Each structure stands twice: as C-alpha cells, then as structure tokens.
A protein has these predicted regions:
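Acidic/histidine-enriched, beta-strand-rich ligand/metal-binding domains
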Residues: 2-21, 25-113
C-alpha cells in the first residue's frame, strides 16, 4: 500500500503512514476478480473504491468512519507482521471490514515505507 500525503502522521515499528485531507493512493501487488482500486480520504471519511466482477469493471465505493482509519491501518500492520487473523473494527461498515479482511488475509495490500 503506497500512501501519499502530508499530515498528521500515524507511526509504528514498520514506518510512518500519513493521513491527509486530500487523497490516499493504494496499490495492489496482484490482481484478482475483486480488487481495491483506490483509497481516498476526504477529511471526514475513508472512501474505498472496490471493483467487482471478472474484469474488475464494476466500481463500488464504500466509506468508513474516521474512527475506523487507525483500526484499518492496524490490520494492515498486523498482516505485514505475520498475523494470520484480523480482528474487525466495530466502527467500520461491514462491507469495508469484509473487503479489507479479504484483501489483507490474501496479502494483496503491501505497505511501502
């Protein structure tokens, strides 16, 4: 996952993740029938564009509450640290949690420091 931004910063042992008021960019390491094509931050909500279908042609946009952002990042960190399971966050919408858990468990999101 490549994160492009300015501030504020959430830091951990893997490096720094930047949360901006304009945009995040996310990159998948491999393609699948379902893929996250973009992650945008509008200052209030995390917006995830999730393409479905055999040709990834159908776009769906999901949102998560601001309070869910750190929990989602923690899930990314956990997978990168070798965790085999992800604990869902109650503040995230069910669809966002499901999408992230699926993508993270299959190691399709990779943090680039």
């Amino acid at each position: 996952m490549t994160v492009t931004s300015t501030q504020p910063t959430i830091s951990n042992q893997l490096g720094e993740l930047f949360v901006s008021d304009d945009v995040w960019s996310a990159t998948l390491t491999k393609e699948g029938s379902d893929a996250i094509s973009a992650i945008d931050w509008n200052g209030e909500y995390l917006e995830v564009t999730f393409r479905r279908g055999s040709n990834n042609s159908d776009p769906y946009v999901y949102t998560a509450k601001t309070s869910a952002v750190e929990a989602i990042l923690n899930a990314v960190r956990a997978v990168l640290s070798g965790a085999s399971t992800i604990v869902g966050d109650a503040t995230a919408t069910a669809s966002v949690g499901s999408v992230y858990n699926q993508m993270l468990k299959s190691n399709q999101l990779v943090l680039v420091n």
